[in-house]
């Protein structure tokens, strides 16, 4: 480190001297490129140690594959399920319970019972597209009940018609679109009967080994669809529920009713399971199911023979199929079903592609690949070879007829050997090329190892493809990364003569490399002195000198320019492209390998994968939603708005037992009657007559309110006239009340304006009230006496008998019945 510090100090002092004695005309701008930028390469203490690996072994290439031409057909395992049609038959009984009120019928409850249709009725469906309107229900105790459609007690035939809601896989036929709904007696519960025959044309799927099959409606039958009762196929359903008929005639499609086309079924099975009867055609398994399916045909293929296997190569599929050398014999009937198909394919491919130039080299062979694919291989041979072979045989026949067959075989073997030799020669050439390349690489590494002892940095930089500083430390290389300087600050001096401390250029000593000045990146703008090295490497210091050689011409490369120094002075700069290149690179002229775009091989298409599942969830959900929509439409047509209190009270009272049920009937009748009354009033108010009547009543109420208001206002304004109307009578009238005579005389005004009132006679015990009041002033005692007199007068008028009182005194009808035989007594007599 001390030596490095001294070196940098010397460089700094020299740079200071040069800056004093040099001006801008003494240097030029140096060029650079991106591959070799201006850099300082020095070896630090912490470096990486590297070495060349010369222990490389090159194995010779050897191929033991034998190629032959032909084409092949590939079959895959058929994963699709066995699909067949199934019909289901069901009788659906509906018992709706209703309650009838005045003008409305409430739907309370509905009981649905499903029954499997008997076989004899299914025969009627299959032959005439009809079913019966009566159903026999057998209880576990042996009791048989009969139910009739619409409670008509008649067994008739009903026509089947398609349901509006259907899916792709299912078609449903019914006899009753809207369930029968009877209107019972008023204020009583009633139950009616409705029969609906439901026939569904569904699709069933079974998967190998065919131990069960599932319908698209979601129903399952635990048994083989190929079971005929005696062939030993798996069947787990009760055999007493299974009926097998032979030579059965049935309507093929129920869409046209009894006019539909009929078909003859060799064997048909009827299975009663739960509330459904199933029927399907029984077929032979070997005739209906094939376990193999054609996948693809490779019209141009190669077969490479190795020690233990065959490799079937397809350029079209960019794939190779590996199979063992043992060929197969397809004996299973589920596999021999493909024989006619692939023999036809072999004939068609040969006639269309190979008939002109090739001949079949023997019969086809069947192999099983490692991916469980069945491969049928058809070898081919060129006709030109066959013609040559036949010509040689014919020539031999003229000379020697005894040894024809042996020479024919020898000639064929020779021709095949020639083909194999050419093939092996090409393969060996490629192998030798690979081995030679390996040996050349080994020798190149050895040469680089030796050259690294002379110029380690150059060798390592070429190996890594970027500037690297390297130094040989014994038997290993120490490498480090070079430090890049500020590229724009590098300046190349025009003079290569040595300058002493006084600034005088020497005539005898010169620099062997041009001087440059530069600065570091992201540092102070101090200029550092160095010398230009190879590939734009900057060598620190200026101690690399030599004796001047006059005359001399030296060219130094910097970036994309070549700087020419004549007699150690820069004369000009030329582009590096003007200097001719010494081409020492030996190019390998070989065509590149043809592009191979790999194809995505779909062994099974999405449609096949979907058909491989026995349970098709999508179709089952579609069927469920379609049937649910149909039921919703039917229920919407028969359902009515039932008051919530009716169902609530009915459910509560049903929990109380028989007493609660009876009490609930009474309460329901009463509540229904009250509800009808309230509903009648509301309905009356809703019609035009009721609305007009209510408007008239409202007007009458308003008029009454106005009259009462006016009368009340009149009372407030004239209380005496309203409270004592008799006070307005003439004073000349004489009233006798209870033996009292009151004589009223007209009032006479005196001179003072007063009024004199004279009372002639009063009842015994009463004081005479008379006097003359003058003026407008009355004392409180006078006012009190006047009020008492008014009160007495009012009471006398109120005690006067009237016609209404005499009428009210008559006994009522109830009193006369109650007190019959008695006679009323007069009050005076009493």
From Swiss-Prot:
Keywords recorded for this protein, A-Z: Disulfide bond, Glycoprotein, Host cell membrane, Host endosome, Host Golgi apparatus, Host membrane, Host-virus interaction, Membrane, Signal, Transmembrane, Transmembrane helix, Viral attachment to host cell, Viral envelope protein, Virion, Virus entry into host cell
Localization per record: Virion membrane; Host cell membrane; Host endosome membrane; Host Golgi apparatus membrane
Glycan attachment sites: 155, 247, 286, 329, 361, 486
Intravirion topological intervals: 710-830
Region (Hydrophobic membrane proximal region): 634-686, 644-685
Superkingdom field: Viruses
Keyword NAD: no
GO biological process, one term: symbiont entry into host cell
Disulfide bonds: 41-482, 58-438, 131-197, 290-337, 510-548
Involved in fusion and/or binding to host membrane: annotated span: 98-104, 184-191
HAMAP family listed in its UniProt record: HSV_GB
Family: Belongs to the herpesviridae glycoprotein B family.
Protein name listed in UniProt: Envelope glycoprotein B
């Amino acid at each position: 480190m001390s030596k490095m510090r001294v070196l940098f100090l010397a460089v700094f002092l020299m740079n200071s001297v040069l800056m004093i004695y040099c001006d801008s005309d003494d240097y030029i701008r140096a060029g650079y490129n991106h591959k070799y930028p201006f850099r300082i390469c020095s070896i630090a203490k912490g470096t990486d140690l590297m070495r060349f690996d010369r222990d490389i072994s090159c194995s010779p290439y050897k191929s033991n594959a034998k190629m032959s031409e032909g084409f092949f057909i590939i079959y895959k395992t058929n994963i699709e399920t066995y699909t067949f049609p199934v019909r289901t038959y069901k009788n659906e009984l509906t018992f709706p319970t209703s309650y009838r009120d005045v003008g409305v019928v409430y739907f309370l409850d509905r009981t649905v019972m499903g029954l499997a249709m008997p076989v004899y009725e299914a025969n009627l469906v299959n032959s005439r597209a009809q079913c019966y309107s009566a159903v026999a229900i057998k209880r576990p105790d042996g009791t048989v009940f009969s139910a009739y459609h619409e409670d008509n007690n008649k067994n008739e035939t009903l026509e089947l018609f398609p349901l509006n809601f259907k899916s792709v896989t299912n078609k449903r036929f019914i006899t009753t679109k809207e369930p029968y709904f009877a209107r019972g007696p008023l204020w009583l519960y009633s139950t009616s009967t409705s029969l609906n025959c439901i026939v569904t044309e569904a699709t069933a799927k079974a998967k190998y080994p065919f131990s069960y099959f599932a319908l698209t409606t979601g129903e399952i039958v635990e048994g083989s669809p190929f079971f005929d009762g005696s062939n030993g196929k798996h069947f787990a359903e009760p055999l007493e529920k299974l009926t097998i008929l032979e030579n059965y005639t049935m309507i093929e499609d129920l869409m046209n009713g009894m006019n539909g086309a009929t078909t003859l079924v060799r064997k048909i099975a009827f299975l009663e399971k739960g509330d459904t009867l199933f029927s399907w055609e029984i077929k032979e398994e070997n005739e209906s199911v094939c376990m193999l399916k054609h996948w693809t045909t490779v019209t141009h293929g190669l077969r490479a023979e190795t020690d233990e296997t065959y490799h079937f190569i397809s350029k079209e599929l960019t794939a190779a199929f590996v199979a063992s050398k043992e060929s197969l014999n397809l004996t299973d009937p589920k596999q021999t079903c493909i024989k006619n198909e692939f023999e036809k394919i072999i004939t068609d491919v040969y006639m269309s592609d190979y008939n002109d130039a090739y001949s079949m080299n023997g019969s086809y062979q069947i192999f099983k690949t490692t991916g469980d694919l069945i491969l049928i291989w058809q070898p081919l041979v060129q006709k030109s070879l066959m013609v040559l072979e036949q010509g040689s045989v014919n020539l031999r026949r003229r000379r020697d007829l005894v040894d024809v067959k042996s020479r024919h075989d020898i000639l064929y073997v020779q021709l095949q050997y020639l083909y194999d030799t050419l093939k092996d020669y090409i393969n060996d050439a490629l192998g030798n090329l690979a081995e030679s390349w390996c040996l050349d690489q080994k020798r190149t590494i050895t040469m680089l190892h030796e050259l690294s002892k002379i110029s380690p940095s150059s060798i390592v930089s070429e190996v890594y493809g970027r500037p690297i500083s390297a130094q040989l430390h014994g038997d290993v290389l120490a490498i480090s990364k070079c430090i890049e300087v500020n590229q724009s600050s590098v300046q190349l001096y025009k003079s290569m003569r040595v300058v002493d401390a006084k600034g005088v250029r020497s005539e005898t000593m010169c620099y062997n490399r041009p001087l440059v000045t530069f600065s570091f990146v992201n540092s102070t703008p101090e200029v550092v002195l160095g010398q230009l090295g190879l590939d734009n490497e900057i060598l620190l210091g200026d101690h690399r000198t030599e004796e001047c050689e006059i005359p001399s011409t030296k060219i130094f490369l910097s970036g994309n320019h070549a700087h020419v120094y004549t007699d150690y002075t820069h004369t000009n700069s030329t582009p590096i492209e003007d200097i001719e290149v010494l081409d020492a690179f030996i190019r390998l002229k070989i065509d590149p390998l043809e592009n191979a775009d790999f194809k995505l091989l779909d062994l099974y298409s999405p449609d096949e994968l979907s058909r491989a599942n026995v349970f098709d969830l999508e179709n089952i959900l579609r069927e469920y939603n379609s049937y649910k929509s149909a039921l919703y439409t039917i229920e919407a047509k028969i359902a009515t708005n039932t008051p919530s209190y009716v169902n609530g009270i009915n459910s509560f009272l049903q929990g109380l037992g028989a007493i609660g049920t009876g009490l609930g009937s009474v309460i329901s009748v009463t509540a229904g009657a009250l509800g009808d009354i309230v509903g009648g009033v509301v309905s009356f108010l809703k019609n035009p007559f009721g609305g007009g009547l209510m408007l008239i009543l409202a007007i009458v109420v308003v008029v009454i309110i106005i009259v009462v208001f006016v009368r009340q206002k009149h009372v407030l304004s004239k209380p005496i006239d309203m409270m004592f109307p008799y006070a307005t009578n003439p004073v000349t009238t004489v009233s006798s009340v209870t033996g009292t005579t009151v004589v009223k005389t007209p009032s006479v005004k005196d001179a003072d304006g007063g009024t004199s009132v004279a009372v002639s006679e009063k009842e015994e015990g009463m004081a005479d009230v008379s006097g003359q009041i003058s003026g407008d002033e009355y004392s409180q005692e006078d006012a009190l006496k006047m009020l008492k007199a008014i009160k007495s007068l009012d009471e006398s008028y109120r005690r006067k008998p009237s016609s209404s009182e005499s009428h009210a005194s008559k006994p009522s009808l109830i009193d006369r019945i109650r007190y019959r035989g008695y006679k009323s007594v007069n009050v005076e007599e009493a």
